[in-house]
Amino acid sequence: MALGWRVSGTNRSEQKVIEARSIGISSMIFDQGTPLKEPEKVFSDVTHIIASIPPSEIGEIALLLHSDELRDAASLTWVNYLSTPAVYGDRSGGVASEFDEPTPTSKRGERRLAAERAWIDTFSDTRVSVQIMRIAGIYGPGRSVIEQVAAGRARIIEKEGQVFNRIHVDDIG
């Protein structure tokens, strides 16, 4: 926004919409299963999309509801789908990289891999570049160990030699 970009987004709650608008982000409600109002208008001047909505049991909801409008968005050039390393499955302590074939072993991983493929397939015959970012170990405000302990969500992970990546929430967007 400081560089002149206009940023828009969706949220599931009215409170989050209000918070986004308070910092200059145009925001609207998009709840799983409810299509956006006037999607053609919403997507008419969109150039970039960062998609972070977790897929549901029935699939990638944004595409199930709006793939036609997104494909018809003449100004759209780039999509980044935020996925998870869960698509690599259980590597028994081994390291996974983007060159490894995804072999999910959980429902979450299977759904995310299906969503990745849905985004890629939706734009496969267009000029839109689709990128997949598999992020893990998110930390930042609302995600610290102290906050997890206070909320009763803290976990102890004891695995000899385990390594993992960390990324600050501000560095994702």
Each language-model region and where it sits:
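Conserved Rossmann-fold NAD(P)-dependent oxidoreductase catalytic core, especially the SDR/UDP-sugar
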Residues: 67-107
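N-terminal Rossmann NAD(P)H-binding glycine-rich loop of SDR-like oxidoreductase domains
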Residues: 1-5
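NAD(P)-cofactor binding segment of oxidoreductase domains
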Residues: 39-81
